[in-house]
């Protein structure tokens, strides 16, 4: 049965989080590992097993060539793939693997299928990146109800219970992107006034600066470049990230990596102290890159820093003291610290999900498009139809004409950005409008219309008003995924899901079998004197051997393991029956519950695997109850009468 809840997902560069509305409040859902955030990491073991999240991150040092991290930085990037063995994966596919885990873990928590989601993106993501994110969600099996800007979502989490009118600046520095948004909040209306940012700036860059420093120092001291060793580099990356985190609360930390490499003389260790002052000096250029977007957002909103009532920090990287100090210097006030920077975006996404499902009333979200949208006109200029920071959804149109006599077609090239030369902006897509009746230049009337929906997805149409001929385009994602391609990827994703479930079932069966052997051997040892049925004891010992043989057979499937375990369980039940009969008179009322797992859930005294749940008192759900999962037009602008 499908849940009517809409999952809110913060699909992050380094970590992801997900939440759902529970009553009137959004709640973070812990993943299968019990954590409130999930590393955005995917890995492939040598045997083909796919690992996602914490298990993938934990094995990155041993398996760096088959581990994928920070894939969000490549969303919507034309032609980008990651090669693992004989397979190539697009950013959408890798992101879908992360989203699949999120979907599975959420379903486990809710006890129902989860079909719908709100997924957040950096406010400064362009249309390709937004569409790519939506594609990833669909590949993972979600109906993506809405794409929401991360700072906007965070403000919803912050202002859910606050009806006062106020202007809020959201400073969002995540693992791979930086956004700053100015919003007006009041009466349940969340209106984004302006947004700016840098899609190539995030916590990963702080890590990289520290990695460069440590590697340089090590090379100066030992003549070895650790960057040329993938395993050493991964260890260095993990250590740099940990040091960055520690320096948020400490003035100094030590990076200690024994046996980082070796020479003919033996192993070489890395041990180096890093002070916060050194780290901040190494990354001063990075923090400086946040200044202009912040000032530009205030300028675009026509606000001064004194107009800002509250400052909200979003993203784990905002925990760095230098970031908090920079924000305070820019805005003139100390940021709010009552919102968890790692969880605020997911919580806000859940709120938006609640709005869409009808569970949350009286909230209106008015978001904006972060970059201007337009087309290339004569001379390669960029003609804007929709200006940046326009509230969405929106639609704008403009009439153009031909620039040459008897021109019967025009190529419409759609761009997004703020540069005056079209080619210096991001090309989103192109299409051709044909069938224009031959006429002198300047005669045809061609109306170009832009429409942006609530997800920030762009639709463009061009119509020759004389002939009525029209063509349109919906800007596709980074790889231009068709519906058929998405369907195929969904099937592949579903196939992996089934493989993962089958692998998990086999592991659980092995665990149950091993536990049953242990319980049986313990029973025989501890009750040797009371067991006088030699034939039954021999049968149990034979059943134990059968289970051991199946466990030693690497080709044995789940059914074979379960069958052997069941046979052993039946033998144990027989012993339980005999011991029950022998003890009942002495035990008194209720005493017989101690017999060899004969009662529900097995039992804790003597142990056993007979009852529901099995495995000696594991209780309902059995031995696996506490197990971890392993697991591009020449024309003229008629409106302005400029050559175009």
UniProtKB/Swiss-Prot annotation:
Gene3D superfamilies: 1.20.1270.10, 3.30.420.40, Actin, Chain A, domain 4, Substrate Binding Domain Of DNAk, Chain A, domain 1
One MF annotation (Gene Ontology) recorded for this entry: ATP binding
SUPFAM superfamilies hit by this protein: Actin-like ATPase domain, Heat shock protein 70kD (HSP70), C-terminal subdomain, Heat shock protein 70kD (HSP70), peptide-binding domain
A Pfam family recorded for this sequence: HSP70
Residue segments, region Disordered: 490-533, 570-644
Superkingdom of the source species: Archaea
Bias type Gly residues, positions: 588-622
Composition bias, Acidic residues: 523-533, 624-644
PANTHER family assigned: HEAT SHOCK PROTEIN 70KDA
Family, per entry: Belongs to the heat shock protein 70 family.
Protein name listed in UniProt: Chaperone protein DnaK
Annotated source species: Halorubrum lacusprofundi (strain ATCC 49239 / DSM 5036 / JCM 8891 / ACAM 34)
